[in-house]
Amino acid sequence: MSGYGRFAYYYDRLTENVDYGKIASWCHELIEKYSSEHEVVLDLACGTGSLSEALARLDYDVVGVDLSEQMLEEAMDKRYDSGLNIQYLMQDMTELDLYGAVDAVVCVLDSINHLENEEAVRKAFESVSKYTCDGGLFIFDVNTVYKHRKILADNAFCYDLDGLFCAWQNELGDDDSVSIYLDFFEEQEDGSYCRFSEDFTERIYSDEFLTKLTADNGFELIGKFDGFEDKPVGDDTQRMLYVCRRLNRG
């Protein structure tokens, strides 16, 4: 993945369909139901901080971690406006270095799919396990093979926004990965347009691999859901949500 550069500035405008309040409420329901502690939540791969803000409004102390400096700049601008209790850290999710344990870790919106190989996923889970308190939750999701093959595939999308045009092209690989190429055309003051590009790849990690990885890192798998609601996983599930609880180290 090349990383989010200028794309970070437009990320929220291109993802206006994402209901962060709904995601936060579902995570809150799961934490209340399955975790003994409900105070500190780590928003892993927090991006521009929209979910961090929604979680903080539910009275959590939130730590947001992301590798992109540009994304975190957008997140901190939001925090300045809202005044919410959120701490942001620029770190790699495979090498977390937090100040202490957290009660829950939330890593959603296919952030795991962005990791470049299975070893990176292993390291990320090891890091999460290290900083999740006994009885705490690890909530994460992944895009499914169905979504990559049937929804994203080789499709193209266009976004015509005020002052910005974005052409989004997907390329499905033989391994069911999807390479995503973004071309932005940004309107200048003189009416001309400046072009810039971003690209990244989302990879598929099997349910068997992820389930084993949770157990290998001291987590009990509580359940799997179709997205952000109490709905069982089906053949046409696009986003699979895993809910895991950290076993006592004892």
Where are these regions (language model features)?
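C-terminal lobe and adjacent flexible extensions of AdoMet/dcAdoMet transferase-like proteins
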Residues: 201-250
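Class I SAM-dependent methyltransferase SAM/SAH-binding core
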Residues: 42, 50-95
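SAM-dependent methyltransferase
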Residues: 119, 139-211
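Conserved class I S-adenosyl-L-methionine
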Residues: 1-45
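A short SAM/SAH-binding and catalytic strip from SAM-dependent methyltransferases
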Residues: 103-119
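A short acidic, Gly/Pro-enriched loop at the edge of an enzyme's catalytic core
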Residues: 94-104
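A short glycine-rich, Lys/Arg-flanked "PGG" loop and its adjoining helix->strand segment in the class I
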Residues: 122-134
